[in-house]
A protein has these predicted regions:
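Acidic, proline/glycine-rich intrinsically disordered inter-domain spacer in sigma factors
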Residues: 77, 82-106
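A short, charge-rich alpha-helical start-of-domain segment used by transcription regulators
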Residues: 1-19, 23, 113
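Residue-level preference for hydrophobic side chains embedded in well-ordered alpha helices
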Residues: 9, 13, 17, 38, ...
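DNA-recognition helix of helix-turn-helix
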Residues: 133-157
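Sigma70-family region 2
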Residues: 37-54, 73
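Arg/Lys-rich amphipathic alpha helix in sigma70-family domain 2
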Residues: 60-80, 146
Length: 159
């Protein structure tokens, strides 16, 4: 891929990829590394994607890098809750209700959390989410519905 194309994609999507990677990894430092790896891969490899599908392709690459990173042997186990709490500062002006919704989302298992995040926070269609997570569209729909049902239980005081 040409340098100009990578710069254009970086300008258009780096912030969204960073937010996604922060959310996925739980660490802004890890997210920076993941986003850097995605764009370095674009510079180094002959990359082909369908026109108009750049964003989906980049998020698929980022999701794969995140999974690889979380699986790596050098990755420490456990989650530093204080670090996760600090990461929320990246998301602007959370009011109490938005904060409660986001906290409830963060408490969901990955299988429910990621489809909900990608659909409601990143604006992806079920079809695009299926491609990113490598599951069927019907599985995306089921996971979103089940995740929303689980969140509803935890958010009853706000309803």
């Amino acid at each position: 891929m040409k340098n100009e194309d990578v710069v254009r994609l970086f300008d258009a999507y780096a912030d969204d990829l960073y937010r996604f990677a922060v959310y996925y990894s739980g660490s802004k430092h890890d997210a920076e590394d993941i986003v850097q790896d995605v764009f370095l891969k674009l510079l180094g490899d002959h990359v082909e994607y369908k026109p108009g599908k750049e964003k989906t392709y980049l998020f698929t690459m980022a999701a794969n890098k995140c999974r690889d990173y979380l699986r790596s042997a050098s990755r420490k186990t456990g989650v530093d809750l204080e670090s996760c709490e600090n990461e929320l500062q990246y998301f602007d002006d959370f009011n109490e209700r938005n904060r409660a919704v986001f906290d409830e989302l963060m408490n969901l298992d990955y299988q429910f959390r990621m489809p909900i995040y990608l659909h409601y926070y990143a604006g992806y269609s079920y079809k695009d989410i299926a491609g990113i997570l490598k599951i069927s569209e019907s599985a995306v729909a089921v996971r979103i519905n089940r995740g929303k049902a689980l969140m509803k239980i935890g958010l009853e005081e706000y309803l």
